[in-house]
């Protein structure tokens, strides 16, 4: 179980053991977008609405490093025809943006710090792949895909933390989908 890659299902297991309101109907909606032009999904809700729980649920469902069949037994997603097709079929990269924004030494070069952390772990997880020197994240993903056929499922939690944590850098007002790329470019 890695920090970013294939974290397993323990976090969702802990959630389900408590009083859990079944929100697994999100899974078939995401499944329907796999291998389509609409494969990039953004779940937006107000704060404290359960987005982090949903992210952990998606990690548990897609992560190939664990078996989550029993964890989802009796939940809504299990009834969907696509359930078995995608269950535990991907290497999942989970990124909680607040784990970076909370570290003052990383705030100046946030995107680079995120890439460096993920790249380091990916190279550890796939040591037999040949990588170009000074590879960025896209180069590393491409090298792994071409070397192994491995496909990745990215889950980015607290992506809007960039807008909350850097209000002084917001040049645009409005939707975080518009603001975040501008802040990331700085």
Model-derived regions: residue spans:
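Phosphate-binding site recognition
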Residues: 1-186
């Amino acid at each position: 179980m890695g920090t970013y890659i294939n974290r397993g299902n323990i976090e969702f297991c802990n959630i389900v053991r408590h009083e859990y309101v079944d929100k697994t109907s999100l899974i078939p909606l995401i499944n329907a977008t796999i291998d389509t032009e609409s494969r990039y999904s953004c779940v937006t809700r107000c704060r404290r609405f359960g987005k982090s729980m949903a992210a952990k649920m998606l990690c548990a469902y897609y992560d190939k490093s664990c078996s989550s069949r029993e964890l989802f037994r009796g939940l809504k997603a299990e009834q969907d025809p696509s359930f078995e097709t995608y269950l535990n079929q991907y290497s999942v990269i989970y990124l909680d943006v607040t784990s970076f924004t909370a570290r003052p030494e990383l705030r100046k070069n946030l995107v680079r710090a995120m890439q460096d952390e993920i790249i380091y772990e990916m190279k550890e997880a796939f040591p037999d792949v040949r990588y170009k020197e000074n590879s960025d994240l896209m180069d590393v993903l491409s090298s792994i895909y071409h070397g192994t056929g491995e496909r990745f499922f990215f889950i980015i939690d607290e992506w809007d933390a960039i807008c909350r944590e850097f209000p002084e850098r917001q040049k645009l007002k409005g939707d975080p989908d518009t603001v975040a790329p501008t802040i990331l470019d700085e």
